[in-house]
């Protein structure tokens, strides 16, 4: 489905009447893992949304938004006028996306795996009607694995970062919507009394340059009281990299180790 973000109506107009051409984009991912299928999947998880923002002379002329319910998901089609265009494309499985085409941002209530690319192109009558487009991962993943025994009463695991990014500037691909709100997950009751099974992954939008943040990882009971916590300083994050911490949370004096996931861009390990 397409929506105009300017007063340039391209819908229901024949290409030859407007000096325009229908262009279909075949969207793929480039992140050192299996490439997108037509269901747009990465690391075994399907993307849920795809946006294409079409700009002419720095003005947005149309937005195409697809969801995973569309039969042509991953192959959006645009009617593009002849001349120079800038296209910005985002694919994500983030939660509750909020698109602002004035500020050119997408902000999610929960960040998940997300891919982006932006490029310039010139459309003529000779332009191929199908174009392949490769997107790049623009998230960091912070994974925390708890190795020691989970005590009775543990209900949630809470990660509270000093800095976290919930949005992307879809023109530049840079992170936006900085926040320090905590992110929590429920601990399954079947995990109580077990060791080495509790792990949680948290995603943030990131740029290509490494940055750091402090965070607190806490276990809470059903009354929201803290059972145990650990503070980690200077956790290194960057796009297309998984930063992995593992160690003891409930044992006194426990330390956490750190790694970078080799299934993503590179490999790295730390201790807390």
Q: What is the predicted function of each stretch?
A:
Residues 41-101, 153-241, 266-272:
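Tryptophan-paired
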Residues 2-33, 144, 240, 261-272:
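Bacterial Sec-dependent N-terminal signal peptides
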Residues 105-138, 143-147, 231-272:
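Extracellular beta-sheet/turn segments enriched in Thr/Pro/Gly and aliphatic residues
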Residues 22-26, 51, 88, 130-132, ...:
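Beta-strand secondary-structure signal
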Residues 27-44, 145-153:
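Structural motif
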Residues 18, 45, 137-139:
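Short, surface-exposed loop/turn motifs at beta-strand boundaries within globular domains
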Residues 110-190:
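Acidic, serine/threonine- and glycine-rich low-complexity intrinsically disordered segments
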